[in-house]
Amino acid sequence: MPAWFLSIMLTIMLVTGGVAAPRQVSEQAAGTYPIPVLMYHHFSQNVDEALASRMIILGDNFEEQMRFLREQGFTSLTYNDYLAVLDGEEPMPARPVLITIDDGYESNYTIAYPVLKKYGLKASIAVVVSSIPDIYGKNFPGYPHMSWAQMQEMEGSGLVEFHNHTFNLHRDVNGKPALVARLDGEGEEAFKYRVRGDLIQARRLLEEHFQKPPNALSFPYGAWDQAVMEAAIDTGHRVFPTYRWGYADGNSPVLPRILIDDIPIAEFVQIVEGKTRQGKNP
């Protein structure tokens, strides 16, 4: 049994209220740890729009951050790259960083992707599959999402991977995140069956369009519990980005992340250099 699987089982045992218990940050392997896992969502060229939400970053600021990573010799890893390290197939590179994006907004293609290409950096995008406009023939006013064609172009570059952010569980149900919310009168087996069905539907569509299954499941709102994790593992997912603030340690497939928005570049530098040891995602 792979060491990473034993690690995830231990993490599940420590789950309390859908949030994994804190882990000690490892300081091993020639100073390659802690590993910053940067989390982005939407990108904009409009200052007022960017200031209105912590989930939006100005394109110019994103470029400044990516330029720093390239100039300072960071190695960008995708979720699949990280999994290869966990499986012992690849060594951990010097100065690793994961650039991760959630939801699948079209700004990932129009703003973030050109920057990634310019600096030769890799990123992983977790998509809410039901929000892809090709699915239902409509898009979201104000915050359009990427089409399959746009995503396939990005994936074909070798710089971007696409992963699962559920099919249609990025919403609220009875005041709770849908991924963990039980419907009225729903038992645990029925709940797990429903969650598995959603994850399988998203996974099938992603595999159909990219000719490979998504290995990562990014939990909407960072919410998960033991039943959700079991369903995720049962459906073939092996890397689990969360919303909990912190650094990855290179040993666990459950990844804390750090939300990045329009922070000063000096603060960004402190984060990616591993010098910011306490924080909280909004």
Q: What residues fall within each predicted segment?
A:
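Sec-dependent N-terminal signal peptides of Gram-positive bacterial secreted proteins and lipoproteins
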Residues: 2-22
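Extracellular/periplasmic catalytic domains that process cell-envelope and extracellular macromolecules
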Residues: 29-34, 90-93, 117-120, 154-157, ...
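Substrate-binding cleft of extracellular glycoside hydrolase catalytic domains
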Residues: 81, 100-105, 118-121
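Acidic, His- and aromatic-enriched active-site or binding-groove loops in soluble protein domains
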Residues: 237-247
